[in-house]
Every structure is written in C-alpha cells, then in structure tokens.
Amino acid sequence: MERNVILAKNAGFCFGVKRAVDEAIKYQKEFGKKIYTLGPLIHNNDVVNYLEDNDIFAIELSDADSLKKGDVVLIRSHGVKESVIKDLTDKGLIVKNATCPYVTNIQLKVKKCYEQGYKIIIVGDENHPEVIGINGWCNDSAIITNGKTELENIPAKVCVVSQTTEKKETWNKVLNEIVRASKEIVAFNTICSATDVRQKSVQELSKEADLVFVIGGKNSSNTTKLYEICKKECPKSYHIENVKELDESLLEDESVKTIGITAGASTPDWIINEVISKIKEL
C-alpha cells in the first residue's frame, strides 16, 4: 500500500548538540586519549555508544575524584553550575566547555539578576541537568516550576527564565501567574528558537498525519515534549528510540495514509533515515 511519509522540518540534531558532539570528537583526536563528559553528552543511547567506541566516556560528577591530573573533562551542552567548573580546574583537570551558547546566555543572565537582588524563577524540570546547572549560577536559590502546580508566595521582585526545551504554553502559563503577583518582573523567554520552530512544525505535522513516530531518547526532555504535542493532535503518536522499536503492526492499519516523522534534538540523521527506510520497505 502506497503511503505518504512526511519528515518534519528541523527534525534531528540542533546546533548545540551537534556542536558538543563535534567538540568531543575533536578533543579526543587532539589529546589522543580517553576523554570524559560530565553525564551523557546527549540524551541518546545510540550516540553515547558511538562516542564510547571513540574513547569518549560519560562519568558522574562524583566520579571526577578518581580522575588524574591532566585528564580531559568536557562540559556537555546542558552546562553545569559555576562552582563545578572551578572545582574541576582546581583538581588539575583539563576542562573543555561545550555548553550550548543559548544555555550560557541564560546562566549569565541569571547570575547578573541574582547579584542585582532579583529572586530567580526557572520554568522547567527541576531534575534536568540544564536546570540544575542554571540554578547553580544563583547559588542554588531559584524557584523552579514545571507549571503543573500554582506558584505560592511569589516574591515582589523576580527574574524569570526558561529551560531551553520548555513548551511555549507552559512558559506563558507561568508568566501570567507571576504577572498577577509580582510588582517588578524581568522576564527572558529563553526557550531556544530552534525548539520553538521544531514544536510549531510538529504541531502542524501531527494535524496532517494519521500516524506519527517521534524518534529520540526516552530520557530526552525535548523529545518527550515533541511527543506530548503530537499526541494532542494525533492520538496515534509513538515515541521510539530507533528502528528496533518500530512496531510494524501499526503500519498494517489501512486507514493510515500519511505517516509523520519527527525527531528530538539529540537524534542523528542516520537514526532518522533508518526509520524512514524501514517504513518505506513495509
């Protein structure tokens, strides 16, 4: 049966993720030895395995004590607390920073406003490494909200920023709450422009498609948000990590004429292409 397969615009690697992967490979070749990243460089198991094959290994911050002077540590695109960079440098480690420039921009805004006496509010997931890192630039004092519960005791003077992969509707909801409660507000919509474009693109795609596959790591925040957006418009939306998770029985439904494909910011082209090729084979 002939089907129309549509790939969403801007699917796959974003600028910050591609930059981090390229930097990791470059530094491994430059130093000619194992290098280490604080946490998985990106939230995609297939890419993490590829990096390990190239002597690039993820470690937790607690493991840094076991590293030797002169070992190379790469800060991933999510960024880290300001204190972490100093601690690693003080240990005699060679620290290379691949924090996404958009995240660095948030960190510096937060630091400046915190020093000016603003209470920082971060719209995002309190357990996400990007948010944990940003919070470290205001002495871990931020109020962090995912928009699912109303904020209480909002201070009169606040600075509001967002996790780069947050949904626009969540940002708007939280900001409306704050506007009603605070007298002095500095708000920076720090949702990455690529994230915004990607989310709008999949919203349109899922309206058009009968079935949607969202490709990306199950631990990827931005992929999960894309899946949530798709599911609202197209009930037959499925989050898969790679072609191995493609449920072929879903393609036996004769009512499915148009299949939409999108992918998170941590999903490389080769994984996307494998899924598309498999669908076209069936």
From Swiss-Prot:
The keyword Membrane does not apply. Keywords: 4Fe-4S, Iron, Iron-sulfur, Isoprene biosynthesis, Metal-binding, Oxidoreductase. Its cofactor is [4Fe-4S] cluster. Transmembrane segments: none annotated. The active site is at E130 (proton donor). InterPro entries: LytB/IspH (IPR003451). Dimethylallyl diphosphate binds at H43, H78, H128, S220, S221, N222, S266. [4Fe-4S] cluster binds at C14, C100, C192. GO terms for biological process: dimethylallyl diphosphate biosynthetic process; isopentenyl diphosphate biosynthetic process, methylerythritol 4-phosphate pathway; terpenoid biosynthetic process. It catalyses: isopentenyl diphosphate + 2 oxidized [2Fe-2S]-[ferredoxin] + H2O = (2E)-4-hydroxy-3-methylbut-2-enyl diphosphate + 2 reduced [2Fe-2S]-[ferredoxin] + 2 H(+); dimethylallyl diphosphate + 2 oxidized [2Fe-2S]-[ferredoxin] + H2O = (2E)-4-hydroxy-3-methylbut-2-enyl diphosphate + 2 reduced [2Fe-2S]-[ferredoxin] + 2 H(+). It is an enzyme of class 1 (oxidoreductase). One of its GO terms (molecular function) is 4-hydroxy-3-methylbut-2-enyl diphosphate reductase activity. Pathway: Isoprenoid biosynthesis; dimethylallyl diphosphate biosynthesis; dimethylallyl diphosphate from (2E)-4-hydroxy-3-methylbutenyl diphosphate: step 1/1; Isoprenoid biosynthesis; isopentenyl diphosphate biosynthesis via DXP pathway; isopentenyl diphosphate from 1-deoxy-D-xylulose 5-phosphate: step 6/6. CDD domains: lytB_ispH. Isopentenyl diphosphate binds at H43, H78, H128, S220, S221, N222, S266. Catalyzes the conversion of 1-hydroxy-2-methyl-2-(E)-butenyl 4-diphosphate (HMBPP) into a mixture of isopentenyl diphosphate (IPP) and dimethylallyl diphosphate (DMAPP). Acts in the terminal step of the DOXP/MEP pathway for isoprenoid precursor biosynthesis. Belongs to the IspH family. This is 4-hydroxy-3-methylbut-2-enyl diphosphate reductase. It comes from Clostridium perfringens (strain ATCC 13124 / DSM 756 / JCM 1290 / NCIMB 6125 / NCTC 8237 / Type A). The gene is ispH.
